[in-house]
């Protein structure tokens, strides 16, 4: 696979992480450190899932085509529903700031990378090429997640967005989850 094709695949895979990062970034309780940890989590799990998928793709390719998207979509929609609920509750403790969420969201936005690894990278014979391609995808996801957090910082300056950030972020996550499950 040439670098252009790999870059297009990396962008496509990282769009879910971009949308989730944008939604998380709208929450005023999420600090810079949390945003960086989410971006690292998204990039790492994108790399890891692609890498694992490439090695196990030939075994599971026929059986697991739609299941990861449904599971990932359900998790993201579930987190979105909790964000909307937290908007109504106005609690100080946020679900997003729970340490487990770095893993839950990181894995849920990266499940499709495992499917890509199953289908596209399972025919690559060199372990170094698989590792390099997987690292590249992880780095692109990390960078796009950081860009999403930067964009969300400017979106929060809009009074309407700031006032309804939990609801907007939650609705976006629910929509992303539904998109992953059904489209």
Curated annotation (Swiss-Prot):
Q: What is its main location?
A: membrane
Membrane topology note? Multi-pass membrane protein
What domain of life? Bacteria
- Keywords for the protein's UniProt record, in alphabetical order: Cell membrane, Ion transport, Manganese, Membrane, Transmembrane, Transmembrane helix, Transport
> Membrane spanning segments where?
6-26, 36-56, 64-84, 101-121, 130-150, 158-178
Compartment list: Cell membrane
Give the matching InterPro entries: Mntp/YtaF (IPR003810), Put_MntP (IPR022929)
Q: Which is one GO molecular function term here?
A: manganese ion transmembrane transporter activity
Instruction: Please give the GO cellular component terms listed in this UniProt entry.
Output: plasma membrane
Q: Write out the function statement from the record.
A: Probably functions as a manganese efflux pump.
Family according to the record: Belongs to the MntP (TC 9.B.29) family.
What is the name listed in the Swiss-Prot or TrEMBL entry for this protein? Putative manganese efflux pump MntP
